[in-house]
Amino acid sequence: MMFTGFPEATIQFFLDIRFHNNIAYFEENRARYERDVKAPFEAFIQELAPAMLSIDPQMELRPYRCMARLRRDVRFTKDKSPFRDHLWVLFRHAGEPREGSVMYWFELAPSGMNWGVGTWGENRQMMDILRRRIVADPDAVSYTHLRAHETGR
């Protein structure tokens, strides 16, 4: 499937699951999820695959490894809502644990979209490297921030 954008039905599904956040509702609407959410996200991952491989040939590109699950782990939270009302995609080295890995991410929610690059959790070694690079070339960091602010990217 070629990526042609996220249809309005994707956001509508997120809104609907937000207000009908239960297993019965999801099962009744599983086909909508597959068509309006899962398929466009998988196409998005496939569309970005060549660019991600050009950045890092070891990038994980299998959709089931890159895409967040809609079903939440509610074991250790007060909010027992079983489903998310948004989804995200993470690109990182294949086989690396999420914690401490550098990753590219994209998130889509009813409130908008967000993307970036960063790490999950604390990684002292990586932060030390980043700090040294900022100190060595602060203009590069300032330019990147200014450019992102001016262009909205």
Language-model segments: which ranges?
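Aromatic- and glycine-enriched beta-alpha-beta binding-site module
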Residues: R75-D137
